[in-house]
Amino acid sequence: MTMTANKNSSITHGAGGTKAPRGTLSRSQSVSPPPVLSPPRSPIYPLSDSETSACRYPSHSSSRVLLKDRHPPAPSPQNPQDPSPDTSPPTCPFKTASFGYLDRSPSACKRDAQKESVQGAAQDVAGVAACLPLAQSTPFPGPAAGPRGVLLTRTGTRAHSLGIREKISAWEGRREASPRMSMCGEKREGSGSEWAASEGCPSLGCPSVVPSPCSSEKTFDFKGLRRMSRTFSECSYPETEEEGEALPVRDSFYRLEKRLGRSEPSAFLRGHGSRKESSAVLSRIQKIEQVLKEQPGRGLPQLPSSCYSVDRGKRKTGTLGSLEEPAGGASVSAGSRAVGVAGVAGEAGPPPEREGSGSTKPGTPGNSPSSQRLPSKSSLDPAVNPVPKPKRTFEYEADKNPKSKPSNGLPPSPTPAAPPPLPSTPAPPVTRRPKKDMRGHRKSQSRKSFEFEDASSLQSLYPSSPTENGTENQPKFGSKSTLEENAYEDIVGDLPKENPYEDVDLKSRRAGRKSQQLSENSLDSLHRMWSPQDRKYNSPPTQLSLKPNSQSLRSGNWSERKSHRLPRLPKRHSHDDMLLLAQLSLPSSPSSLNEDSLSTTSELLSSRRARRIPKLVQRINSIYNAKRGKKRLKKLSMSSIETASLRDENSESESDSDDRFKAHTQRLVHIQSMLKRAPSYRTLELELLEWQERELFEYFVVVSLKKKPSRNTYLPEVSYQFPKLDRPTKQMREAEERLKAIPQFCFPDAKDWLPVSEYSSETFSFMLTGEDGSRRFGYCRRLLPSGKGPRLPEVYCVISRLGCFGLFSKVLDEVERRRGISAALVYPFMRSLMESPFPAPGKTIKVKTFLPGAGNEVLELRRPMDSRLEHVDFECLFTCLSVRQLIRIFASLLLERRVIFVADKLSTLSSCSHAVVALLYPFSWQHTFIPVLPASMIDIVCCPTPFLVGLLSSSLPKLKELPVEEALMVNLGSDRFIRQMDDEDTLLPRKLQAALEQALERKNELISQDSDSDSDDECNTLNGLVSEVFIRFFVETVGHYSLFLTQSEKGERAFQREAFRKSVASKSIRRFLEVFMESQMFAGFIQDRELRKCRAKGLFEQRVEQYLEELPDTEQSGMNKFLRGLGNKMKFLHKKN
C-alpha cells in the first residue's frame, strides 16, 4: 500500500515553501545499488489520481496530494526521485530533514538506503530496513517499492521479526531492539491496518519528548500514548489505516539520534517516556490484528478516504446537501484524507524552527497542493464528504500565513454563503493565530483529544476502567465516553471552564492538547448570545452558522447521538431559549414550536441543568398541582389553531353557566372600551433604554411649609432646588409643572400640621405618571430641621426614573447627615451624584465626596438585580386585609379596574399601596398610581381611566359626594369594601384562585417548616413566601408565553396571541386570558420581552424555566380523547335543550 507521511511537516514542493539551496538534497541522498525485491504487487485498493500522481511526480504541486500533512523534506525543487548513481552517501545534514517522512520515492532510493543500512537484509523486510538509515538519507523510503508501490503481504511476517530485531541490534551496536521494534517490523510488512494503528500514537504532543534525527532542536512528545491507543482500539478499521509507521520510525530514530548526537544533550532530556508506554501500543495493535484474524469475512480495512463517504443507507448530512461518489476512484477521498483525516499522527505542538528551514502549513489555502486540488475534485466527484477533521500538526513560524485561517485544511469557500461541507460527526473549526513565542505557538496547534476520528466509533461507549494501560483517567472529565459523546451536544454538568474547547490545561487535561478556538465569527456570536452567568450551559459551538441565513444545524444521526445524553431534558423553553433558536436559524413559526418537533427542538438547545428549587417553592407548587391537576397545555399545530371553532370554547369538562359566560363577555367589552380612553403606555424597558445613558436622578428639592398670611394654615413650597431650571425649553416647562405638583405629594396632609419640638424622621415615596405614561418616582425624607423650640418639618425629595427605594434611601441618609452639619454641604454632594452613571441591574456605582473634618469619602450605591420587594411590607397588608379580600383586590387590579384605598395613617396607605402593586410582579401597573393622594387633588378619582390611589380618612366624606364611576373602594382600617362591583370572586380561574387562597392561608405553616439550606432564607420570610405564591399564579397562567415569541427574518420578535391563549387546556384560564390579554399590563410585559436585548433573568424567568421542565409532554390516547369529546358534545346538547 502506498502511503505518504511527513511527521515533521517540512517544505511542500510548489506550494510556496521556503527554498533552500539546491545542493541540499543531493548531499542527503544515499544511492547504493538496490537489492533484489520481490515482484511488485498492485495495490488492493484503487488509488486515486492524486495518489498516483503523488507517487510518480512528487515535485509537481498541481498533482500532489499530501496525506496527513506530510510533505517532501527536500528544500530544493529538484526531483528527489532522480538521484545520481555516482553520489556517495554523505553524513546526515540534519537541517530540514523530517524524521517521520515516508515518501513514495522510486525503488532506487529505497534499495540504496536499504543496502547502506542493513547489509544482507532479507528482501521482504525492505520497508523496515529502509526506515533505519533515515538519519543519513533525507527522502525516507516508504513501505512500498515501485512507481505504484508494493503492498507487502502479511505472510511470513512473524517469521522474520526475530531476524529484524537481531539486525537492528547489530546495526545499532548497543543492544537488542525492543518488542516495539519487532512489532513495527511485523506491522510494516503486514497489511495496512496492522501497521496503521501504531502510527498516531507517538504523535501526541506531550511532555515526554523524543528527539528528531533531523534536528537536535526538534522534539516530539509521547505522554498521550495510553489515551491514543485506547481511542484507536475502539475505533473502526478505516480510522487506523495510515497510522502505523511513525512509532517504529521514531523509536529507532531515538536510539540513532542518541548515538549520533551525544554532543547535543538538550534534545534527549525527556526521551524515555515512550519506552515506558510501549506495551500500551503493542496491546492495541495486537487487538486489531486479532480482530482481523477472527473476522476474515469483514475483509481488509477500508481506506481512510472512504471512511466519510456518504452512506446512503444511514448517514444524512443536513448542511449543504449530500455528495455522491462515482464508482471509479477515490481522488476526493485522497484529498479528504489529506486535509481531513490528516492529523491523527501529526504533532500536537511545533518544535522550534531551525535557521534555513521552513514549511508551509499543511492545509493552508493557497499553500498546500492538496487544498488546491480539493475544490475541483469535489465538484467532479460529489460522493464523498471531505471531513474537516482537526489536525494535530505543526508548522514553522516563519512560513505561517497569518491571513489564511483554514478550517481543518479545507480551502476557503469562494463566497461566504457556501461554507465547507460538514460531517455527520461534528468537529470544531480550527483557527490558527500567529504566536510570538514557542509556547503560544504550541498551544494554538494543540488539539484536545482524538474523540472525533470516526463517526461510527462514537456510538460505542469507551471502556470505563480507570487504570487501563497503566494510567489513570483525569477525574475532572468523568468518563471518557461522556465527554466525547456529548462534546458537541448539550453540555449539562458544571464544567470548570465556560467553553469546552477553550483553556484546557496542558498537564492535567489531555497533556498539552488544548482545543482549537472557534472561528472568529462563531466565537463572537457565541459571546454575544451568552451572558457570563449563562455560559455554564454551552450551546454546541459548531452549530452556530457563520451566516445567519445558512442552514447550520446538522440533522444527521441526531437520533443515534441523543441516546447517549442525560435523560432529563427540558420539554419546552423559555423566552431566552427562543432567542437562541432564532440565532441558530431554526424555523420559528408557531407550528414548528408547538408540534411534535418541539421535543426535538429542546434537544438542539442547551439542556438546562435542573436548578435546586427551594423547599418553600416546592410546597407552594404542590398546592397548585393538587388543585389544578397535571394537564397544562394542549399540543397544537397552526392548522388546529386557525380552525378552532366556538364549539371548542364549550367543549371542556369545566362547564360554566350561561350567566358566567355573559358576565365574561361584559367584562371583555368593558375593559376594551375603558382602555381605549387610557393614555398610551410606556414600559419600563423602553424608558430605561432611553434613560440609561443619562443622569441618576432628575432633580432634588427641599419642600417646606409656609404659613398663609390670611389663615392659620400652611402651604407646602419648594425652598431649595437642584439643579436650577434656567433654560426656558419645553422640557423645562414640563419640569416646572411637575415641580408645582411635588410639594402636594410631599405634604398631602399640610393643613393638619402645627409646629412641633420633636419628630422622628420618616421615609416614604410616591409615583408621578406623566401624560405620555412615563413614570417618575419621588423618594422623600421628612424630618425636623436643626434648631430649638417648636418648628415645622421639611421634606427632602429626590425625583428619578429609577425605581430603587433602597438606593435612594442611602442617598437620603447622606443628605440628612450633611444637612445636620450645614445646608451648604448638600449641594456639592448632589452635584457629584448627578454626574454618576445610570447603574445597570446588579451593578454598583461609586460617588466620591468631600466632607470637612472627614476628608474624601466614597459612597457605594448598588442597584439590586430585582427590586420587586424593595420598600414592600406585606405584614401591614395582611394586618389590614383578610386573604379573601386581598385576592379580590388582586383580581380587580389584574383587570385594570379603579381601586381606592382609605386609611387613617399616611404610612398605612403608602405601605399597602406599594405592597399591592408588588403582588403584580412580573407585571407592572401601567396607570395612575398615587399611594397618598392630596386632598386638593381628590378630583382625580373621577377620571374614566384605571387608577390606584390612597386617600386619608379625612377625605372620605368628600369622596362619597363625587360622581365616581365603577370602582372598588377599600377601607383598610375595617377590612371591608365601601363600594364594589360584586363580581370580584369570579374574575380569576376558580382552581387557581382556590390554590392561591390555600397557600396564603397556610403562610405561617409554610414558613415555619424547616428549610434545607441557608440559601432558602430569602424565601423563608413573609415577603418571600407571598411573592412566590403570586409568581406561581402567573407561571400557571402565562408561563408558556416564551413558546409563542417568534422572530422574523429582520430579527424582530412578535407574539402569537391567539396561539398562546388557545394552547391552554383549561377553559376558565382561557377565558381569563382573553380579558387579561387586553390589559396594558400584559401588553407592556410582552413589549418588554420583544424589546429585551440582554439575557438577564429575574425570579419569574427562573420559575418559568422550572415550570416548562415540569410540563408533561404526553397527550391523551385516541380512545380517551374520543370518549371525552363525545361526553362533552352530550353536555353541550343538554344545555341547549
UniProtKB/Swiss-Prot annotation:
Record domain cDENN: where: 868-1001
Q: In which tissues is it expressed?
A: Widely expressed with the exception of peripheral blood lymphocytes. Isoform 1 is expressed in several epithelial and fibroblast (including tumorigenic) but absent in lymphoid cell lines (at protein level). Isoform 3 is expressed in primary cell or weakly tumorigenic but not in tumorigenic cell lines (at protein level).
Phosphothreonine modified-residue sites = 231, 364, 482
GO CC terms of this entry: cell cortex; plasma membrane; recycling endosome
Q: Where is the composition biased (Basic residues)?
A: 432-446, 562-573
Q: Does the keyword rRNA processing apply?
A: no
In this chain, composition skew of type Polar residues spans 1-12, 49-64, 456-481, 514-524, 539-558
Q: PANTHER family, from UniProt?
A: DENN DOMAIN-CONTAINING PROTEIN 2, DENN DOMAIN-CONTAINING PROTEIN 2B
Protein name listed in UniProt = DENN domain-containing protein 2B
Species per Swiss-Prot/TrEMBL record: Homo sapiens
